UniProtKB/Swiss-Prot annotation:
A motif ('HIGH' region) lies at residues 53-61. Its EC number is 6.1.1.1. GO terms for molecular function: ATP binding; tyrosine-tRNA ligase activity. InterPro entries: aa-tRNA-synth_Ic, Rossmann-like_a/b/a_fold, Tyr-tRNA-ligase, Tyr-tRNA-ligase_arc/euk-type, Tyr-tRNA_synthase. It is an enzyme of class 6 (ligase). GO terms for biological process: tyrosyl-tRNA aminoacylation. NCBIfam families: PRK08560.1 (NF006330), tyrS (TIGR00234). This is Probable tyrosine--tRNA ligase, cytoplasmic.
Length: 342
């Protein structure tokens, strides 16, 4: 192979990696695109995604899971953080006495989801937050970070993620500082999360340098709206389709979604846009093929797709995605009961 061919091949590999890393993202924070390129020219990007151990994961988790698959295919060094301590810091969404059981639940279901989309989990590092967040160096850095941040700083940083209340708990204020420190202690170049994490990401960019640590890259995927609300949330049963929901429960939830003929403000269309079209390259609704959400929306707005047909197709595709995950999880009923007391 001559020198020109080698250069062209390296350029092709570089561009493929950049495309995989950046596609389907909602936002990459300012100036970070160029930093990504500088790193990729030298070595593989180190990136982490953290998930707080709270309510049961839902179909909205397919968004980060599919993006993680992209990162792995781009040869990034990917770390997944199971943030168990964060789970109870956030207004005790996960009771302390259940946190260990819920960690095992999350670890299993996230790995099953990754395998269900064809991601090689052997190329991912899985970390439990409490395995390093109780170490003396981490805790002392947390004290130092708290000396630089005010109540207002931390309350603002967590306002889109941490549950808000009139008398804010100190634990909720610690949450953003710990998430900032995780970037340093996981030794990564970048943190990936939903766009609801933006204020925490900016908090990290502002305050980590005060401890002498570098600013990290931040990548954000869009947040999936709830079935009948602004955000699909693990802690809001009415907003989500749980990954353990039965076929009948899934059908019922989708059938109850607002879906007026010709009206694009529908939770059913959101499921197609944020989940189904990220999973499938082509779908069929009433025997017609579609390769983009834009085409589905166009036909629905023109009343060429009836709400009943839209809901039926939505239910069918979600059930195909969820059924193998549910079946695998139900092999360990005892683990589920211990995690969620039911």
């Amino acid at each position: 192979m001559d020198e020109t061919s080698i250069i062209n091949e390296n350029t092709d590999v570089f561009e493929k990696k950049i495309t995989l890393i950046e596609r389907n993202l909602q936002e990459i924070t300012i100036n970070d695109k160029e930093i990504i390129r500088k790193i990729i020219r030298k070595r593989n990007l180190k990136i982490y995604w953290g998930t707080a151990i709270t309510g049961k994961p839902h179909i909205g988790y397919f968004l980060p899971i599919l993006k993680i698959k992209d990162f792995v295919e781009a040869e990034c060094e990917v770390t997944i953080l199971f943030a168990d301590i964060h789970g109870f810091l956030d207004n005790l969404k996960a009771p302390i006495e259940l946190i260990e059981n819920r960690y095992h639940y999350y670890e299993k279901i996230i790995k099953i989801m990754l395998m269900s989309v064809g991601c090689d989990i052997n190329k991912i590092r899985f970390v439990k937050g409490s395995d390093y967040q109780k170490n003396s160096d981490y805790v002392f850095d947390l004290y130092k970070l708290c000396s630089y941040t005010t109540e207002r700083d931390c309350k603002r940083a967590g306002s889109d993620v941490v549950k808000q209340r009139d008398n804010v708990l100190l634990s909720s204020l610690i949450y953003p500082n710990m998430q900032a420190l995780d970037e340093e202690y996981l030794k990564v170049d970048a943190q990936f999360g939903g766009e609801d994490q933006r204020k925490i990401f900016m908090h990290a960019k502002t305050f980590l340098p005060k401890l002498g640590y570098k600013k990290r890259i931040h990548l954000m995927n869009p947040m999936m709206p709830g079935l009948n609300s602004d955000k699909m949330s693990s802690s809001d049963e009415l907003s989500k389709i749980d990954l353990l929901d039965t076929e009948q429960q899934i059908n019922k939830k989708i059938n109850k979604c607002f879906c007026e003929e010709g009206n694009l403000q529908s939770g059913v269309l959101h499921v197609f846009e944020f989940v189904i079209f990220h999973y499938y390259t082509s779908i069929s609704i009433n025997k017609k093929s579609y390769t983009s959400i834009e085409d589905v929306k166009k036909d629905f707005e023109m009343k060429l797709i009836h709400p009943k047909d839209l809901k039926l197709a939505c239910s069918n595709y979600i059930n195909k995605m969820v059924t193998p995950i549910r079946n695998e999880m139900l092999k360990d009923i005892d683990m589920i009961k211990k995690a969620y007391n039911n």
